[in-house]
């Protein structure tokens, strides 16, 4: 007789306090040793809220035994520093988290222009999270537990009414038609096109925001999936959206070229429902033998053109999306990144 995890019949709850089980996972010759023998650099712990701090620390010790500079990222949906969890607060086991807590308001900001929610969570993160955690958070396009990125920005079935029990998570789309419908549903071409433009703006923000720009496999080529489990389709080798792929490659190239973004300080300069401006400051002043001070990112989240005000004689545009260079305006749902020397 087995207990089910969250009442899912094929998910068996294991005894986390069992010494035999702990040894099976963390002991010499155990599962973690086997994984590192395959050449991995670290692990992501799923549903850390259901594990004890002691067990997570055992897993960290097993990782450290194999690779002293291992990386452990924890899946947690809340602010772990308010949950009195030692696995993250002592810095000895988990190094960082999946950034559900901030990715939710970022998606809400783009879809619903909810600047209040975004400002609240940005303030909380910068005030309560250590820099080492902020710099290594997984800022994801989507994950295995939510609809695909392109579906999240299609605004179909998107509900966030005040007082709704799902108010906290923007990826809880309406489920009125059931799993069979979800498994075969494809976005209409016009909706897909509009959603694609929005996800590019999402990519732009994640590129310059502190943390790891994390792409859930398939999001880079436009994989669709409404809800869980439709989001877990195999990679569409013969149906690749080259436009999305090209955009993400451009964004990732920026991350590689401007290495100071990994540890740059962040300041929010403006945040309204229509406009989001932040800067990343180069503390070391040098990167690849080039001197520059910072990058300013200007996002037009509104529906009208936005004059570009932050560019001066000492700056140059290094990335743009929906930007009219002739008239020096950012078009609706566009963005510009300015390198300041």
Segments from the language model and where they lie:
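Carbohydrate-binding surface patches
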Residues: 269-312
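The substrate-binding groove and active-site-proximal loops of carbohydrate-active enzymes
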Residues: 7-24, 40-50, 106-113, 183-195, ...
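A structural motif
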Residues: 37-40, 211
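Solvent-exposed beta-hairpin/edge-strand motifs
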Residues: 311-323
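Aromatic/acidic polysaccharide-binding cleft in carbohydrate-active enzymes
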Residues: 138-185, 203-242
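C-terminal beta-strand-rich structural cap/linker in extracellular carbohydrate-active enzymes
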Residues: 325-341
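Active-site-proximal helices and loops of the catalytic beta/alpha 8
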Residues: 30-33, 41-140, 205, 222-250, ...
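Substrate-binding/active-site clefts of carbohydrate-active enzymes
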Residues: 1-38, 59, 65, 82
